Design a protein with these regions (language model features):
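Glycine/charged-rich beta-loop-alpha catalytic/anionic-binding loops adjacent to active sites
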Residues: 2, 29-32, 55, 80, ...
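Glycine-rich phosphate/diphosphate-binding loop of Rossmann-like nucleotide-binding domains
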Residues: 2-40
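Short glycine-rich or small-residue beta-strand-to-loop segments that form or flank ligand, phosphate
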Residues: 3-8, 32-34, 60-62, 83, ...
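C-terminal binding/interaction regions
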Residues: 8-15, 19, 93-131
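Short, solvent-exposed amphipathic alpha-helical segments in soluble enzyme
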Residues: 20-26, 49-50, 76-79, 127-129
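N-terminal beta-loop-helix "entrance" segment that forms/cooperates
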Residues: 33-55
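Glycine-rich phosphate-binding loop
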Residues: 47-86
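Short, acidic/turn-prone active-site loops that include or flank metal/cofactor-
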Residues: 87-91
Length: 131
């Protein structure tokens, strides 16, 4: 069983989340990586995140660009801590994703790190796991 579930919305996002893989590995934290879109595969994505606790995951890292629905969507279907990583994309170069990740409605908590900062997302996950 892995401790951290890492989800991004598109295969093209993988290079942006890969720094988290290195941080988690160095810290001895197991993780599992998935590509699943809140927009294109909402049912599959909901099932993946809803079942995370039963599979032994303790933290979710969700990365997305543009409208960046994935972190908030993930937080809406789990009670696990969700860390959102906004990705630089489109004409606003990630500002839209940052605001979407940081401004999730009340009652749907998402911890938000800086644009393209998968390293800090992984470091935060490690701290949560060690708390």
């Amino acid at each position: 069983m892995a401790d951290v579930l890492i989800v991004v919305g598109s295969e093209s996002d993988k290079p942006r989340i890969e720094p988290a893989f290195e941080v988690l590995s160095k810290a001895g934290v197991s993780y599992e990586f998935h590509v699943s879109s809140a927009h294109r595969q909402p049912d599959q994505t909901a099932d993946l995140v809803k079942g995370a606790r039963k599979k032994g995951f303790r933290v979710v890292i969700a990365g997305a660009g543009l409208s960046a629905a994935l972190p908030g969507f993930a937080a809406s279907v789990t009670d696990l801590p969700v860390i959102g990583v906004p990705f630089a994309a489109g004409p606003l170069n990630g500002l839209d994703a940052l605001l979407a990740t940081a401004q999730v409605p009340g009652g749907v908590p998402v911890a938000c790190v800086g644009i393209d900062n998968a390293t800090n997302a992984a470091l935060l996950a490690v701290r949560i796991l060690k708390a």
